[in-house]
C-alpha cells in the first residue's frame, strides 16, 4: 500500500482501517458524528492535480461518497456544524455527512493567513490581500458556505481562534473577542507579552507567551 489510515476508539481498540494502493493519503479525519471517516488522496484529473475526498462509514471498506477537488491545494480537513470542511488555498468547501455538497466559499482576498473551525455553526477565516503585510479581512462563514460577516483590518494579527460563540483575535498590542457577526464583544489592551491565543467554549481565552500562559475572563 502507498498509505493507510487506522481509526481507534477511546480505549485504543482499532475500529476501522483504510488502505490506499493507488494514491497517497494526505489527510484524514473522523467526522463529528463519530460514525464516518473522511480521507483525502492525491491524484490527477485530466492532467491536473486533484484531491479526492472519500467518506467511509466506520466498519465498511466501500466509500459512501467520492468527490474531487481540482486546481487547488488542500490544507486541512475539519468539521463545521457536522459538515466536512475542506480548506484549500482558494476556498472553503463543505460536504454533508453523506457526501453531498453543502456549500462553498471562495476567498475574496487571495491569501489565507489563518483559519479556525471551532465556532458554533461557523468557520472563521483570516484573509490577506497581499502575500505579506497587514491588509487583512476577517470573515465568518456558515455551514452552508454563506458569508455571515466580514471585517477589514490594517493591524498585525498574531493569532486567531474560534470556539463556541466567539472569535479571539490577538493583535500586536491587544486581544479582541468578536461575535460571529464580527461585533466587538470584549477587549484587553497591553498584550505585547502574548504570542498566540486559544478561544474556549466557555467564553474565556488563553493567552500564550514564550514561557507562560494567562486566562482572560471577559
Segments (PLM) and residue ranges:
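Repeated scaffold domains used in trafficking and secretory/extracellular systems
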Residues: 22-32, 69-82, 107-120, 152-165, ...
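A short beta-strand motif characteristic of beta-propeller blades
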Residues: 13-19, 61-68, 100-107, 144-151, ...
